[in-house]
Amino acid sequence: MKKNSLYNTSTISLVQYLFAIAVILVHSGRLTSYEPVHFALKSILGRMAVPFFIVCASFFLKQSLRDSRKMKAYLIKIIKTYLFWSCVYLPYAWLFFSSLNLPAYLFPAGVLIALVYLGMCYQLWYIPAFLLGLLLVNQLVKRLGMLWTGLITLLLYCWGLIETYSAYLDTTSLLKGYQLYSNLFFTARNGLFYTPIFIFMGYYLYDHFHSQNFRVHRWQKLAVAFGFLCIEGVVIFQHEGMDKNFFFLLPFVTVYLVNACLRTSFLKTYDLQYLKQMSMALYFSHPIFIEWARYGFSNLPLSYPDRGKLMFVVALLGSHLFGLVMLSYHNWQKERKNRSSNKEGL
């Protein structure tokens, strides 16, 4: 993410870093026995992380749509990153597959499904879902325009809302239809139903960044949208559904949050690019430390909340240590490249 005098990318990097920590919190399991706090942390705060990542990425990608070279370079970079981490988590995928007691000859098919759909580990679903959503939204925008793309992505997102509101839809044909779907495809949190609306929101924000809707009263609009999201959370908390990946107000809260971060003067003069890189290190590496802690502490006589807190601390420290090593390596590579360039210049 390059510095731009128009956009506050420093605050974006900071919030991405904080949301990466929120993802670790979600994957660490239960941190408290008090249900309302557990729900707020895991189902509201934690669920805002990936949408924020998607809206930010698509906002900055929108300007590259007409530059095929930039888009190609971005896609190659993200695919290389995804394939690298898929190889890292291949042993984890094998252990998970083995726990299902399925024949070994089905493992290649399982790897293929994981690679193109579910992810080799529970945080990697985001990349194939983002890429599929990007392809879908780009084709819709190209063929139908932004208005129809917005309506279609919203309708697709509403299909996923069925899992969140399933307790209110008991015995309805909608729920029966969704159950048939989930038996085949496991989840609607994918590149067809989940990511397109957030990609569209990023595109929409880029196109209308200078409109009055996003310029005026931005923090007030964010506060109102977040307040309604909390009310929606209370409704869902009363009767929790099959899963809680989809909140109706989440796309609107996310786009107003990204807009507010891009416009604020807070930290704008600081270079916090390293926090963006650190957030990527945390996001991709934290399951390694969570699973080590889960195995290492399995025999300790701890309650679920205490075990969750311990795993969170271990994963937080371990992934930060990995991030520092990664940043040091990248800086060393950059300095080495600069020295080589200077020698060639001489």
Regions found by a protein language model. Give the residues of each.
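Alpha-helical transmembrane segments and their immediate juxtamembrane cytosolic regions
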Residues: 1-346
